[in-house]
Amino acid sequence: VRAAALAKLGAAGAKVLYDVGAGTGSVSVELSLMAGQADVYAIECEEKAVELIGKNRERFGCGNLHVVFGKAPQALDSLPAPDAVFIGGTKGNLPEILSILFEKNPSVRIVVTAILLETALQACESLEAFTSKPAEIMQLQVSRSKKAGKGHMLCANNPIFLISAGGCADE
């Protein structure tokens, strides 16, 4: 899922990247390692998660990764305009977050992950309110094998939606 999200983000050549709702920072770290000289901002409002992002930044030597403790959209106010943004969590503030992002950069590339149909629909509608191109929705379904008697069966995990729009990432 992370690899697909990062591919949709199309962050090559970006100078400023955000990971909103960064959690423990797995996407932030990967963006940092991929981005070279770009500045990556991991925005997270849970204190324990912020501590883990800091530890992961040190562990993987991500000097270009900046940890921002705060809740979006307020935590975005003082940050430089982003070229691309991954949104993994919004605490219900997705329209407000998108408004700030497109205000900072009208051509920003955004990828949102969602597990709820309602969140996917909200992301699609909100993104399309700010862009001239339709948003793209991709559903990813992962199944893992499990031993079942003499054979194996596949057990499905819940689907995840990737909603992307804006910018000029390869389609």
Give the residues covered by each predicted segment:
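Short beta->alpha hinge that forms the Motif I/post-I loop of the SAM-binding pocket
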Residues: 44-49, 89-90, 115
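Conserved SAM-binding loop of SAM-dependent methyltransferases across substrates and taxa
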Residues: 24-36
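Core SAM-dependent methyltransferase catalytic element
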Residues: 150-171
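S-adenosyl-L-methionine
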Residues: 43-82
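Conserved class I S-adenosyl-L-methionine
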Residues: 14-23
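C-terminal substrate-binding/active-site "lid" region of AdoMet-derived donor-dependent transferases
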Residues: 98-156
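Conserved alpha-helix/loop element of class I SAM-dependent methyltransferases that forms part
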Residues: 1-13
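Conserved S-adenosyl-L-methionine
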Residues: 33-40, 104-106
